[in-house]
Protein backbone atom coordinates (compact mmCIF):
# COMPACT_ATOMS: atom_id res chain seq x y z
CA UNK A 1 0.00 0.00 0.00
CA UNK A 2 2.97 2.35 -0.34
CA UNK A 3 2.73 5.12 -2.93
CA UNK A 4 5.00 7.90 -4.10
CA UNK A 5 3.64 10.05 -1.25
CA UNK A 6 3.13 7.64 1.67
CA UNK A 7 4.68 4.60 3.30
CA UNK A 8 2.62 1.79 4.82
CA UNK A 9 3.52 -0.88 7.38
CA UNK A 10 1.46 -3.80 8.67
CA UNK A 11 1.74 -3.89 12.48
CA UNK A 12 0.78 -6.63 14.93
CA UNK A 13 0.49 -5.10 18.38
CA UNK A 14 0.22 -7.27 21.49
CA UNK A 15 -2.13 -5.52 23.89
CA UNK A 16 -1.97 -7.58 27.09
CA UNK A 17 -0.20 -10.43 28.87
CA UNK A 18 -2.97 -12.84 27.82
CA UNK A 19 -1.77 -12.62 24.24
CA UNK A 20 -4.57 -10.55 22.75
CA UNK A 21 -3.36 -8.60 19.74
CA UNK A 22 -4.57 -6.08 17.20
CA UNK A 23 -3.39 -5.70 13.63
CA UNK A 24 -3.28 -2.39 11.85
CA UNK A 25 -1.97 -0.58 8.82
CA UNK A 26 0.33 2.24 9.84
CA UNK A 27 0.53 5.01 7.25
CA UNK A 28 3.33 7.57 7.22
CA UNK A 29 3.97 10.58 5.03
CA UNK A 30 6.89 9.78 2.73
CA UNK A 31 10.17 10.88 4.34
CA UNK A 32 8.47 11.58 7.69
CA UNK A 33 10.59 13.73 9.96
CA UNK A 34 11.28 13.13 13.63
CA UNK A 35 9.00 15.02 16.03
CA UNK A 36 6.87 16.50 13.24
CA UNK A 37 3.64 14.55 12.72
CA UNK A 38 0.30 14.26 14.55
CA UNK A 39 -1.02 10.72 14.96
CA UNK A 40 -4.52 9.40 14.25
CA UNK A 41 -5.96 6.14 15.62
CA UNK A 42 -8.82 4.72 13.53
CA UNK A 43 -10.77 1.78 15.04
CA UNK A 44 -13.02 -0.34 12.78
CA UNK A 45 -16.74 -0.71 12.24
CA UNK A 46 -18.49 -3.77 13.61
CA UNK A 47 -17.98 -7.29 12.35
CA UNK A 48 -15.29 -9.88 11.82
CA UNK A 49 -13.70 -8.83 8.56
CA UNK A 50 -10.53 -7.54 6.97
CA UNK A 51 -9.48 -3.90 7.05
CA UNK A 52 -11.47 -2.36 4.22
CA UNK A 53 -9.59 -0.71 1.34
CA UNK A 54 -6.68 0.65 3.41
CA UNK A 55 -5.82 3.32 0.84
CA UNK A 56 -9.29 4.89 0.79
CA UNK A 57 -8.19 7.42 3.43
CA UNK A 58 -4.64 7.92 2.20
CA UNK A 59 -5.18 11.69 2.25
CA UNK A 60 -4.46 11.68 5.99
CA UNK A 61 -0.85 10.64 5.43
CA UNK A 62 -0.66 12.85 2.35
CA UNK A 63 -1.55 15.76 4.64
CA UNK A 64 1.13 15.02 7.21
CA UNK A 65 -0.64 12.64 9.59
CA UNK A 66 0.60 9.28 10.84
CA UNK A 67 -2.54 7.14 10.74
CA UNK A 68 -3.05 3.73 12.36
CA UNK A 69 -6.13 1.90 11.07
CA UNK A 70 -6.77 -1.20 13.15
CA UNK A 71 -8.89 -4.30 13.50
CA UNK A 72 -9.83 -5.54 16.98
CA UNK A 73 -9.94 -9.36 16.83
CA UNK A 74 -6.28 -10.24 16.34
CA UNK A 75 -6.86 -11.48 12.78
CA UNK A 76 -4.29 -10.82 10.08
CA UNK A 77 -6.00 -8.62 7.46
CA UNK A 78 -4.14 -10.51 4.73
CA UNK A 79 -6.24 -13.63 5.38
CA UNK A 80 -8.57 -14.60 2.51
CA UNK A 81 -12.08 -13.16 2.52
CA UNK A 82 -13.43 -16.72 2.78
CA UNK A 83 -11.54 -17.24 6.04
CA UNK A 84 -13.10 -14.15 7.58
CA UNK A 85 -16.53 -15.35 6.45
CA UNK A 86 -16.00 -18.76 8.06
CA UNK A 87 -14.79 -17.22 11.33
CA UNK A 88 -17.73 -14.83 11.34
CA UNK A 89 -20.22 -17.66 10.82
CA UNK A 90 -18.60 -19.71 13.57
CA UNK A 91 -18.23 -17.06 16.26
CA UNK A 92 -20.38 -14.08 15.32
CA UNK A 93 -23.59 -16.02 15.90
CA UNK A 94 -27.25 -14.98 15.81
CA UNK A 95 -27.44 -14.20 19.54
CA UNK A 96 -25.32 -11.07 19.51
CA UNK A 97 -21.97 -12.51 18.48
CA UNK A 98 -18.82 -11.10 20.02
CA UNK A 99 -20.69 -8.02 21.26
CA UNK A 100 -22.68 -10.31 23.56
CA UNK A 101 -19.75 -12.52 24.57
CA UNK A 102 -19.38 -12.41 28.36
CA UNK A 103 -22.11 -9.83 29.02
CA UNK A 104 -23.04 -11.55 32.28
CA UNK A 105 -19.79 -10.34 33.89
CA UNK A 106 -18.33 -6.91 33.13
CA UNK A 107 -14.84 -8.17 34.00
CA UNK A 108 -15.06 -10.94 31.40
CA UNK A 109 -16.90 -9.08 28.64
CA UNK A 110 -15.29 -9.38 25.20
CA UNK A 111 -15.03 -5.63 24.69
CA UNK A 112 -12.98 -5.19 27.86
CA UNK A 113 -9.71 -6.12 26.15
CA UNK A 114 -10.77 -4.12 23.08
CA UNK A 115 -11.23 -0.95 25.14
CA UNK A 116 -7.92 -1.60 26.89
CA UNK A 117 -6.31 -2.20 23.52
CA UNK A 118 -7.19 1.33 22.42
CA UNK A 119 -4.94 2.70 25.16
CA UNK A 120 -2.21 0.29 24.10
CA UNK A 121 -2.50 1.59 20.53
CA UNK A 122 -2.05 5.13 21.81
CA UNK A 123 1.00 3.95 23.79
CA UNK A 124 2.40 2.65 20.51
CA UNK A 125 1.63 5.77 18.48
CA UNK A 126 3.10 8.12 21.07
CA UNK A 127 6.29 6.05 21.13
CA UNK A 128 6.99 6.72 17.45
CA UNK A 129 9.94 9.10 17.02
CA UNK A 130 8.07 10.91 14.23
CA UNK A 131 5.14 11.85 16.50
CA UNK A 132 4.97 15.60 17.09
CA UNK A 133 4.68 15.10 20.85
CA UNK A 134 1.38 17.00 21.07
CA UNK A 135 -1.46 15.68 18.90
CA UNK A 136 -3.27 12.35 19.27
CA UNK A 137 -6.52 12.17 17.29
CA UNK A 138 -9.07 9.34 17.28
CA UNK A 139 -11.48 8.93 14.39
CA UNK A 140 -14.03 6.32 13.32
CA UNK A 141 -17.58 5.48 12.33
CA UNK A 142 -20.27 3.22 13.81
CA UNK A 143 -18.42 0.79 16.12
CA UNK A 144 -15.30 2.75 15.17
CA UNK A 145 -17.01 5.96 16.24
CA UNK A 146 -17.94 4.32 19.52
CA UNK A 147 -14.35 3.23 20.09
CA UNK A 148 -13.05 6.69 19.21
CA UNK A 149 -15.16 8.21 21.98
CA UNK A 150 -14.22 5.42 24.39
CA UNK A 151 -10.54 6.05 23.69
CA UNK A 152 -10.98 9.78 24.26
CA UNK A 153 -12.79 9.08 27.53
CA UNK A 154 -10.17 6.62 28.75
CA UNK A 155 -6.98 8.38 27.71
CA UNK A 156 -6.21 12.02 28.45
CA UNK A 157 -3.53 12.02 25.75
CA UNK A 158 -6.27 12.26 23.11
CA UNK A 159 -6.41 15.82 21.79
CA UNK A 160 -9.04 15.53 19.03
CA UNK A 161 -11.99 13.14 18.68
CA UNK A 162 -14.10 12.54 15.56
CA UNK A 163 -16.99 10.06 15.51
CA UNK A 164 -19.66 9.21 12.93
CA UNK A 165 -22.98 7.77 14.17
CA UNK A 166 -21.42 5.93 17.14
CA UNK A 167 -22.66 2.43 17.87
CA UNK A 168 -22.78 0.91 21.39
CA UNK A 169 -24.67 4.01 22.57
CA UNK A 170 -27.70 3.97 24.88
CA UNK A 171 -27.77 0.20 24.37
CA UNK A 172 -30.12 -0.61 27.25
CA UNK A 173 -32.70 2.04 26.31
CA UNK A 174 -35.01 -0.72 25.11
CA UNK A 175 -35.66 -1.62 28.74
CA UNK A 176 -37.87 1.48 28.95
CA UNK A 177 -41.09 1.13 27.00
CA UNK A 178 -41.18 3.22 23.84
CA UNK A 179 -37.44 3.95 23.70
CA UNK A 180 -35.05 2.89 20.95
CA UNK A 181 -31.64 1.57 21.91
CA UNK A 182 -28.38 1.61 20.01
CA UNK A 183 -26.57 -0.95 17.91
CA UNK A 184 -26.31 -3.94 18.26
CA UNK A 185 -29.98 -3.77 19.33
CA UNK A 186 -29.96 -6.34 22.10
CA UNK A 187 -33.77 -6.37 22.17
CA UNK A 188 -33.49 -8.81 19.24
CA UNK A 189 -31.55 -11.37 21.25
CA UNK A 190 -33.14 -13.77 23.67
CA UNK A 191 -32.89 -12.99 27.36
CA UNK A 192 -30.19 -10.31 27.35
CA UNK A 193 -32.37 -7.38 28.40
CA UNK A 194 -34.09 -9.52 31.02
CA UNK A 195 -30.79 -10.24 32.75
CA UNK A 196 -29.80 -7.61 35.33
CA UNK A 197 -26.12 -8.55 35.11
CA UNK A 198 -26.17 -8.03 31.34
CA UNK A 199 -27.88 -4.66 31.72
CA UNK A 200 -25.27 -3.62 34.28
CA UNK A 201 -22.48 -4.57 31.87
CA UNK A 202 -24.15 -2.72 28.99
CA UNK A 203 -24.38 0.45 31.07
CA UNK A 204 -20.75 0.13 32.12
CA UNK A 205 -19.44 -0.26 28.55
CA UNK A 206 -21.91 2.14 26.95
CA UNK A 207 -20.39 4.99 24.95
CA UNK A 208 -22.47 7.45 26.98
CA UNK A 209 -20.58 6.35 30.09
CA UNK A 210 -17.28 7.31 28.44
CA UNK A 211 -18.56 10.44 26.71
CA UNK A 212 -18.91 12.17 30.08
CA UNK A 213 -15.14 11.78 30.57
CA UNK A 214 -14.04 13.20 27.20
CA UNK A 215 -11.97 16.39 27.49
CA UNK A 216 -10.71 16.71 23.91
CA UNK A 217 -12.58 18.80 21.31
CA UNK A 218 -15.04 16.46 19.61
CA UNK A 219 -16.70 16.43 16.18
CA UNK A 220 -19.80 14.22 16.04
CA UNK A 221 -21.81 13.45 12.90
CA UNK A 222 -25.02 11.48 12.42
CA UNK A 223 -27.99 11.12 10.07
CA UNK A 224 -31.70 11.25 10.76
CA UNK A 225 -32.51 8.18 8.62
CA UNK A 226 -30.04 5.84 10.30
CA UNK A 227 -31.80 2.65 11.43
CA UNK A 228 -28.55 0.94 12.44
CA UNK A 229 -27.39 3.60 14.90
CA UNK A 230 -30.60 5.61 15.43
CA UNK A 231 -30.20 9.38 15.77
CA UNK A 232 -31.68 9.32 19.27
CA UNK A 233 -28.65 7.34 20.45
CA UNK A 234 -26.25 9.87 18.92
CA UNK A 235 -28.18 12.60 20.72
CA UNK A 236 -27.68 10.67 23.97
CA UNK A 237 -23.93 10.87 23.37
CA UNK A 238 -24.03 14.49 22.20
CA UNK A 239 -26.01 15.65 25.23
CA UNK A 240 -23.55 13.93 27.57
CA UNK A 241 -20.40 15.44 26.07
CA UNK A 242 -19.19 18.37 28.20
CA UNK A 243 -16.10 19.15 26.13
CA UNK A 244 -15.76 21.63 23.28
CA UNK A 245 -17.89 20.04 20.58
CA UNK A 246 -19.22 20.49 17.07
CA UNK A 247 -21.86 18.49 15.21
CA UNK A 248 -22.86 17.78 11.63
CA UNK A 249 -26.43 16.52 11.20
CA UNK A 250 -27.40 15.18 7.80
CA UNK A 251 -31.18 14.60 7.59
CA UNK A 252 -30.92 12.53 4.40
CA UNK A 253 -28.22 10.13 5.60
CA UNK A 254 -28.79 6.56 6.62
CA UNK A 255 -25.88 4.53 8.02
CA UNK A 256 -23.24 6.03 5.74
CA UNK A 257 -21.22 9.17 5.17
CA UNK A 258 -20.22 10.96 1.99
CA UNK A 259 -16.66 11.38 0.81
CA UNK A 260 -17.06 15.11 1.47
CA UNK A 261 -18.01 14.42 5.10
CA UNK A 262 -15.06 12.07 5.50
CA UNK A 263 -12.66 14.63 4.07
CA UNK A 264 -14.13 17.37 6.26
CA UNK A 265 -13.31 15.29 9.33
CA UNK A 266 -9.63 15.35 8.44
CA UNK A 267 -9.84 19.09 7.85
CA UNK A 268 -11.54 19.51 11.24
CA UNK A 269 -8.68 17.66 12.95
CA UNK A 270 -6.13 19.86 11.14
CA UNK A 271 -7.99 22.97 12.29
CA UNK A 272 -7.87 21.80 15.92
CA UNK A 273 -4.24 20.68 16.03
CA UNK A 274 -2.21 21.94 18.96
CA UNK A 275 0.56 24.08 17.48
Could you tell me what each predicted segment is?
Residues 23-24, 28, 35-46, 67:
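Short beta-strand element of the alpha/beta-hydrolase
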Residues 145-194, 249, 257-260:
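Hydrolase active-site cap/lid region
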Residues 214, 220-222:
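Short beta-strand/loop motif that positions the catalytic acidic residue
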Residues 235-275:
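C-terminal catalytic histidine-bearing segment of alpha/beta-hydrolase fold enzymes
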Residues 224-229, 255-256:
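Acidic catalytic loop of the alpha/beta-hydrolase fold
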Residues 1-35:
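N-terminal cap/lid segment of alpha/beta-hydrolase-fold proteins
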Residues 55-116, 173-182:
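Cap/lid segment of the alpha/beta-hydrolase catalytic domain
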Residues 97-142:
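Gly/Ser-rich "nucleophile elbow"/oxyanion-hole loop immediately N-terminal to the catalytic nucleophile
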Amino acid sequence: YCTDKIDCYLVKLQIDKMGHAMYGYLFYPKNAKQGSHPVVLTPPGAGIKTIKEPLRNKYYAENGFIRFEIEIHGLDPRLPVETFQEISKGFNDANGGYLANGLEDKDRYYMRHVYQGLVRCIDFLTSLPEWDGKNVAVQGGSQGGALAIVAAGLDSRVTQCVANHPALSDMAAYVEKGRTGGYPHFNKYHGILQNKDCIHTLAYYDVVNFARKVKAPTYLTWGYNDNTCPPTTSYAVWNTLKCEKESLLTPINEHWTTTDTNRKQMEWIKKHLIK
